[in-house]
Amino acid sequence: MNAHRTLIISVFIVASCGLAYELIIAALASYLLGDSILQFSSVIGLYLFSMGIGAHLTQYIKDKDVLHRFIEIELLVGVIGGISALALFVAFGLSAAPFRTLLYAFVLIVGAVVGMEIPLVMRVLNQKGAEFKELVSKVLTFDYLGALAVSLLFPLLLAPKLGMARSALLFGIFNAAVAYLTARVFKAELPRYRAIRLRALIVLSILAVIFAYADRISFKAEQSYFGDPVVYQSHSPYQRLVVTRWKDDTRLYINGNLQFSSRDEARYHEALVLPAMQMVPNAERVLILGGGDGLAAREVLKYPQVKNVTLVDLDPDMTATFKTSATLSALNQGSLSHPKMHVVNDDAAKWLEGSSEKFDVIIIDLPDPSNFSLGKLYSVPMYRLVARHLQPQGKIVVQSTSPYFAPNAYWSVVATLEAAKLNTAPYHVYVPSFGEWGFVLAGFDKQFPVPQKFDVPTSYLNAQTAAEMFRFPPDMARRKVEANYLNNQILVSYFESDWNNVMR
């Protein structure tokens, strides 16, 4: 193969690999540590900084050693970048404390060696007689094309199909392959060609073996982290789902955060759904935003007068899993396959904007507002949009985090609903696996009669427990906090601050 062409192809590959490691490490940090904005910002910022350091260090490499050093760096990037995700999974499974140290160590080291690649390629091309203006334009063009390719392939294909660990290893193999190919093309200029080729083959073999066993290793690491045996895991473009089971306790985790335990989820879902359904006795049309596990839908379908339930959940993997898995569909009693159900996989706000339907009860069972993407779904504009789809005597209910552990966030949700010109009735319930958890009822009228009885079978709620839900002790009393608007996303700040105080 032509030497010039080999190096240009190498630029495309190393650029793809360099961005891939950055995306993988940032995504892992956001999944495992939460707060995606902070994690992506800190990882990308530190990565770019370390790339600058790496680029600076290349000036100390002698011209006669440039080609040899480029090949060595490709092997080094392949090994460190390739194992980065798997090592981080294992570290997090053992303990979250050294995870942060290892995370930023990988960012610094991988960023530094990636930063050395392009300057060294340009120097090699320059030594081969490439004209400067052509050299710069070609290298940067293929650099940016490689970045574009991986930015599209990673979220749409690689992460969902291979997962984080195997994606990183695949790019590590690409880096090692570049080293091997470059060594072969330039073997006449490499005094120690055989030794270099042997090292490249060893690295390729090691990465290939680890790639083959990566899922098993990450599976073991996740079992160590979650404690209970992992029975299902998937990585969609939107989130990472993990289901664990120990004896009669099945648990769902999204991005490492517990969503429910089968031992006590009835407390949560009865509290979420039944008060609103009892307050609208002739509710026929119900909308559920989120709730892709089908557990809220299970409670709604207890009411025989319900004619239609529309469930809007962003992640098709979530709804498909809880529809087709025998174990999980048993938990929701087959609600997602019920003839009254209509499941839509779409963004909740986008779907509401495109729909003209009105509903008697709207249940909002979305993940906590831990980042700006979720925070917008708890904003004044969002609740105004929801209200446009509510019948005059209808009710909205929102899961609203914990009024005990995250009081500022909880009461901000109440203030946000009120800023959207809705009347509210806050309430809470104790869920053993979560602790104290909060909800907010909202509607156009001011009447929120506490149910004196329930027309459907319950395992937790009755007249007494329902009355207790609407009483708040002094340590959960209302706080003076701001409503959440898109331009300030104050709710995300409240949520982070509240939970950080709990974790200290």
Regions found by a protein language model. Give the residues of each.
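SAM/dcSAM-binding transferase cores
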Residues: 445-504
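Alpha-helical transmembrane segments of multi-pass membrane proteins
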Residues: 1-233, 237-257, 261-328, 333-432, ...
